[in-house]
Amino acid sequence: MSSLLKPDFNVSKYRLIAQKREANAVEIEAALEVVREFIIKKKLILYGGIAIDYALHLKGSSIYPEGERPDFDMFSPNHVEDAYELADILYEKGFKQVGTVRAIHVQTMRVRTDFVWVADLSYMPPNIFDTIPTLTYKNLKIIHPDYQRAGLHLAFCFPFDNPPREDVFSRFKKDLQRYNLIEKYYPIPVVPVKSTYESKTFSIPFKQVAIHGFAAYALLYQTLNELRITCKVPEWKTEFPQPSYSYHKNDKNITLTIDMPRAYPALVLATYNPEGVIKEMGLHLTEICEPYMDYSPPIFKTNDIHFFSTMFKELAISIIQDNLIVVSPQYLLLYFLYGAFATPADKSLFLFYYNATLWILEKADSLLNIIQKQTSPEEFTRFANTSPFVLTTRVLSCSQERCTFSPAYRISLANDVQQSQLPLPKTHFLSNSLPDISTLPYNYYPGKGKEKPTNFSYEKNLLFNIGGKCTPSAM
């Protein structure tokens, strides 16, 4: 037997030791206290890991060890000016190498001192900032876990976002653990909502779109029910909606007849090219809605069908029945949360469907456990990899070899074009999609002799039009 002691691989423990032994540890702690006071004074809202940790502290739990240095991520309705102001305060208090720079995430400004990041300020439009639910922890406002759920679902919806550290590698495990903690300590109560339904028939393309919204819920529910019958499990008693559907298809189109809530009769589809699909289907565009933060993309509305644009992203999808394409359950959960936030009058309806979708996943998990016991490991792996109820990297295809082009990538490309003074070829997919970088926030370094940038306009840059506002279409 070896006489060597068993090694201690407690990463959190050694991270705390490393932080305390840093040469500038005292200065960093002092800077973070200035940031904390600034957050309280300006009534900004913490989000991300720090907000989850503080919310869990209120329930006697946590995700970070006691004493770990806080990583302050905050929402602000005026994040550029707030970031500049925080930099000025730090500089005036004698901190060195203070600066504010635009982050990779275009709606975020980062503040640093002595080359250590001490604050991330992200833009949230006033109409959302003033209405989102919050909690209070030690005088700090933190985003409510109900809202935080949306960001956790988001990573599962776009597995190839944020290359070269794609979410499927860098976020899936961490976000799933955090989601389970939120669900444990902050479950959304199940409040039944009675809805009246009407049968609606739609004809849609076979390959270019993924069925979304209430229709996707109906398809997933019936797929679950068929799996239950296959597993010979008795019918469940449930108060959740049990809509039905039928369909037939040809080589190009699907004709779908489905029970839709009378309050929301429009079919919702996700597609990489909404305007092209609308034109191909011969529909009339009536309204366009800007994104709602990161949680809902641009929406192109016609009278009977609403198209969620996934342009520049690769959306995770499920395949059910006879190769019907449906959004993943995670994107459906995100849709119902978005509906609860964006339409307060129907919040209870959307949260009821959110819980209903969680119930579907819970029951699907129990059925998968039955199948796993009845099949070989190889057979179960093949079955699970095609199940619409598990996390997936199967994505909705686009017309290019590459589909994921983040705002950061497009800004970088626009910078290259500006510096080289060589425009992209007209045949390049992004030739008409590069942002105007002259309208982006400028970096700011107090004490370097340059005046503080002024008059940043949120309205002049489409990347900051993320309040969910809808306007009639001119088409």
From Swiss-Prot:
GO terms for cellular component: virion component. GO terms for biological process: mRNA processing. Induction: Expressed in the late phase of the viral replicative cycle. Its main location: virion. It is an enzyme of class 2 (transferase). It holds the Pfam family Poly_A_pol_cat. InterPro entries: PolyA_pol_cat_su. Keywords: ATP-binding, Late protein, mRNA processing, Nucleotide-binding, Transcription, Transferase, Virion. One of its GO terms (molecular function) is poly(A) RNA polymerase activity. It catalyses: RNA(n) + ATP = RNA(n)-3'-adenine ribonucleotide + diphosphate. It is found in: Virion. Polymerase that creates the 3'-poly(A) tail of mRNAs. This is Putative poly(A) polymerase catalytic subunit.
